Amino acid sequence: MDSEQDLAFISVPTLPLKPLTIGKNASAGSLVTFMGYPKGGPFKALPATVQGIGNTQTIDAETGRANAMRQVYQLAADVQHGNSGGPVLDENGTVVGVIFGKATSGQTGYAITASTLKQALAEGGNNTAAVSTGSCRKQ
């Protein structure tokens, strides 16, 4: 678990499936696919284009505190609530990122990059401490 990057890693030793491979960062212009349950609906895999890569710092919605700086993709994509935490895959099915947000207007989404994901996994992937689920808020 990495609260600074807003990531949770789940290990299920008895699951009879191989985990997805985390690859290298995608480049600007790359065609990718992101997956999730948009708007709480059924599972969907949708196309996106990496518009660019940059560094950003987000604000924790619970505390108002600035989170760690992280490298992110800006995606031309119809990201919706329910896609957050879902993988971004390249054409080979390799994980190149994880969706974490969208712009307030238009079809722009944001995802952490593979390098940010690998760093968070190396730093906090074995952390088994309990974490707060946060409070429910009206949207």
State each model region's role:
Residues 11-17, 44-134:
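Active-site region of chymotrypsin-like
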